[in-house]
């Protein structure tokens, strides 16, 4: 009897909807597989006290099947060992991105993280939680995206110290959550204009937009020189909101919401010199 009542209520609710009511639908854009490379070099300085580490790093990234210089990173950071098993860190980056449509554009990023670790024989396990904010240094349509995007990254990593070897293989999995994306749940359909009204913009949409898998090995070239050789695979999901500059869906009939999917697979080399 209870199931019948629920079904009757659902049917009545559906019949109560106005005929021709507009429903916000999502299109899909599957970008397929893209390949590229990541190359970086940096300096890691153990300060006084020895619990403090300072780091400077430069990185270049290639995409479009190794055919385009996509991003340039300049980063500085610091980590402090709070306990034998817990570290806290801060960092900042200047990011220059090569966009197909708009050329080179700059962003700045700042973040804070906590990393806990434990060891079992020659195995080492760590969990890192990183909160970051990325601000675009160019004009954006705020009905489509937030000028400053907040994200939370959660990473689990395992590594193994091979006896009498210069190599230390590892594997890591990371989830990235967007924390303040434009929420389309507040969009309303304007019957007189025949368009969606997106002017009630609220930045409170939270969803996972990237899953990253990385595996590789650290190679101790010398006492103070380390080379990281790795492969990285990113599965990306991003909600693209296409509105005009006045906050309404476009008259051309282009889809307002598109879920853009894609997979990136890349090779990486990262060199660190320790002072």
Residues covered by each model-derived region:
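Repeated loop/turn-to-beta-strand initiation elements of outer-membrane beta-barrel proteins
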Residues: 47-56, 85-90, 121-125, 164-168, ...
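Outer-membrane beta-barrel transmembrane domain signature
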Residues: 129-250, 273-275
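Outer-membrane beta-barrel domain signature
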Residues: 26-32, 63-67, 99-105, 141-147, ...
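Hydrophobic/aromatic-rich structural module bridging two neighboring secondary-structure elements via a short loop
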Residues: 68-123
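Outer-membrane beta-barrel "beta-signal"
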Residues: 114, 259-275
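Residues that define the transmembrane beta-barrel architecture of outer-membrane proteins
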Residues: 33-39, 70-72, 104-110, 146-152, ...
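Transmembrane beta-strand segments that form the barrel wall of outer-membrane beta-barrel proteins
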Residues: 22-31, 50-66, 87-100, 128-135, ...
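Residue-level signature of outer-membrane beta-barrel architecture
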Residues: 45-47, 80, 92, 116-118, ...
């Amino acid at each position: 009897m209870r199931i019948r009542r629920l079904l009757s209520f659902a049917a009545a609710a559906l019949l109560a909807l106005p005929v021709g009511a507009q429903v916000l639908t999502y299109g899909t854009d599957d970008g397929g597989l893209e390949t590229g490379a990541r190359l970086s070099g940096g300096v890691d300085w153990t300060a006084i006290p020895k619990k403090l580490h300072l780091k400077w790093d430069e990185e270049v990234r290639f995409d479009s099947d190794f055919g385009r210089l996509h991003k340039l990173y300049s980063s500085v950071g610091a980590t402090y060992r709070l306990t034998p098993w817990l570290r806290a860190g801060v960092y900042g980056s200047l990011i220059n991105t090569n966009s197909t449509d708009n050329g080179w554009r700059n962003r700045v990023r700042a973040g804070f993280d906590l990393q806990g670790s434990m060891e079992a024989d020659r195995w080492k396990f760590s969990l890192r939680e990183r909160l970051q904010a990325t601000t675009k240094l160019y004009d954006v349509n705020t009905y489509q995206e937030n000028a400053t995007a907040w994200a939370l990254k959660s990473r689990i990593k395992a590594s193994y110290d091979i006896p009498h070897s210069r190599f230390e293989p590892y594997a890591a999995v990371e989830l990235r959550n967007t924390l303040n994306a434009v929420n389309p749940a507040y969009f309303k359909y304007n019957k007189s204009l025949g368009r969606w009204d997106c002017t009630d913009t609220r930045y409170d949409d939270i969803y996972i937009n990237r899953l990253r898998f990385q595996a590789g090995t650290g190679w101790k070239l010398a006492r103070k020189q380390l080379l990281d050789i790795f492969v990285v695979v990113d599965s990306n999901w991003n909600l693209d909101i296409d509105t005009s500059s006045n906050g309404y869906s476009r008259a051309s009939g282009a889809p307002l919401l598109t879920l853009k999917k894609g997979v990136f697979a890349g090779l990486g080399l990262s060199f660190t010199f320790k002072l």
